[in-house]
């Protein structure tokens, strides 16, 4: 775990537990993602890191636009001068949410785009294999030449042409 994730995880866990208790997971997920994107903007990041303006003052400018409970959470983060880690808090929140909902994320790397039916079939097969719901991130990377590389958690399934070539190459060289 990186230092950033160690700092962010307690915030994410507290946010998740609160949102789950009050049935606000969807709303808090969206709001955390929005704030995470906001603090990654270069101009906003410069303001946040400025010693001339407190992070609490920055958050107070959007107080009227936020749900009171979510504002209180973000205000706590600001009070602790941790607004810059909101992207990691959001990431950790989603990880906790996925575990809670028995969802795994599959990064599917393809050489070229494929049709929706094939993607749906692949998703169904992955859900059967891993006995859970799957959220798929499709990445197009022509370097793999064909086939697919699928990463789900610590499991990697490399059925790419480039992977097969590398395997064949190592066999021939040994």
Curated annotation (Swiss-Prot):
F-type ATPases have 2 components, F(1) - the catalytic core - and F(0) - the membrane proton channel. F(1) has five subunits: alpha(3), beta(3), gamma(1), delta(1), epsilon(1). F(0) has three main subunits: a(1), b(2) and c(10-14). The alpha and beta chains form an alternating ring which encloses part of the gamma chain. F(1) is attached to F(0) by a central stalk formed by the gamma and epsilon chains, while a peripheral stalk is formed by the delta and b chains. PROSITE patterns: ATPASE_DELTA. Belongs to the ATPase delta chain family. Keywords: ATP synthesis, Cell inner membrane, Cell membrane, CF(1), Hydrogen ion transport, Ion transport, Membrane, Transport. Coiled coil: none annotated. Its main location: membrane. It holds the Pfam family OSCP. It comes from Francisella philomiragia subsp. philomiragia (strain ATCC 25017 / CCUG 19701 / FSC 153 / O#319-036). This is ATP synthase subunit delta. GO terms for cellular component: plasma membrane; proton-transporting ATP synthase complex.
């Amino acid at each position: 775990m990186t230092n950033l994730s160690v700092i962010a995880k307690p915030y994410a866990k507290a946010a998740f537990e609160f949102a789950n208790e009050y049935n606000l997971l969807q709303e808090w997920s969206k709001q955390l993602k929005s704030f995470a994107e906001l603090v990654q903007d270069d101009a906003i990041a410069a303001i946040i890191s400025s010693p001339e303006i407190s992070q609490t003052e920055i958050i107070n400018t959007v107080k009227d636009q936020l749900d009171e409970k979510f504002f209180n959470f973000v205000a706590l983060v600001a009070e602790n001068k941790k607004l810059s880690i909101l992207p990691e808090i959001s990431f950790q929140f989603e990880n906790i949410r996925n575990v809670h909902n028995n969802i795994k994320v599959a990064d599917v790397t393809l050489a070229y785009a494929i049709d929706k039916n094939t993607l749906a079939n692949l998703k169904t097969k992955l859900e059967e294999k891993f006995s859970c719901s799957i959220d798929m991130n499709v990445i197009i990377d022509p370097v793999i030449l064909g086939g697919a590389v699928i990463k789900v958690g610590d499991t990697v399934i490399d059925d790419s042409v480039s992977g097969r070539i590398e395997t064949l190459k190592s066999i021939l060289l040994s």
